[in-house]
Amino acid sequence: MKKAVVLSAVALLSGVCAVADESVLIDFAKLNADIMADKSGGMTHNRRTVLDYASLADTSYTDEQKALMRSSLAVAQWEVVLNSSARNPVAHAASRVIEAPVSEGAKSFAGERVLGVRVLFPTWDSNANAMIKPAFVIPAYEVMAQVDDQGNVQAPTEEEKASGKGRFEDGYGVVKNVGVLKSIAVNTYGMNYPHGLYVMMRDQDGEVHRYFMGYLLFDSWKELVWNNPSYISDVRSREVRLYPVYPASTPHVVFEGFMVTRDAAHAGGDYVGYFKDVKIIYDKAVLSTVRDFADEDLWGIQARREAERKRVEVARFGQQQVLRYIEQEKLATEVGFTPSGGAQRQEEQQ
């Protein structure tokens, strides 16, 4: 039997068993928009997950443009990215993500707000897929901090720093201290579509892995489960390796998004679905994360790496937001033609 490689730093003691744990990777019910109202009065961003890239933008951006470089994991901020065989102007405009309220009388998740998505797949014979993803790459290391009603991230307090918790942990897209994945579960509402569903995750090395959860050919809520076929329960059959603890990243997983696939043999057109959460069961990479030294406070290596990643992200996300703003400003606001004088008189006569 092929031995599984365990990414851990555990002591090699006889009789030690793998310690499994369960965590919610992302819970869309926590991602409701609750701050920063738009012109119509609707909230636009999720307080806990606001990221402001303006502080890292260069001087070529105006203050107005920098104000656009703020985003969050609020459900309405998520995007649908179609592959080349599915991408066309009509499909691009129709495919979108919304914050969907579950009815009060529902048997599951009554009254909660979840992620709802519509994808317009091609109707001709063509393999196609759609990625449902956040507007930005979820950061693995973002110190816990408070956010005010205007979306300004406050400086973390000493207590928040000492907690060791990140802003994107506890159901907001990041789970740390993950060794070997044992199982993944997705709560989704199906409507008898024959499409396949994948969960995409990024590990501590920046590699993105996809896990096939099954087909969406069912009606109502269902928990789709992926079980690791290479998972070995007996630690004596495992190959254990020791890795440097710092400054290497603690093994973790970050949610990258969903992928919905449409086979050319199946009917195309609209797909509509709903997602509540993603959960994982995993072996801990390290039995205890309590250390004698505050390594990151002393050396700041991971913080510098994260800052560099953010600067790269600004080049993509910030410019994209500015271009979208410019396009919005150029949109025609007229709903019809201004009538000429003769046409006006003719309408009055009628």
Swiss-Prot record:
State the source organism's domain of life: Bacteria
Chief location bin: periplasm
The name on file for this protein is: Flagellar filament outer layer protein
The terms describing its cellular component in GO are: outer membrane-bounded periplasmic space; periplasmic flagellum
Instruction: List the keywords (alphabetical).
Output: Bacterial flagellum, Periplasm, Signal
- What does the annotation say about its assembly with partners? The flagellum consists of an outer layer composed of repeating units of FlaA around a core that contains several antigenically related polypeptides.
- Gene encoding it? flaA
List the subcellular locations. Periplasmic flagellum; Periplasm
The UniProt function text for this chain reads: Component of the outer layer of the flagella.
Annotated signal sequence range:
1-20
The biological processes this protein is annotated with in GO are: bacterial-type flagellum-dependent cell motility
InterPro entries named in the record: FlaA, FlaA_Spirochaetes
Pfam families, sorted: FlaA (PF04620)
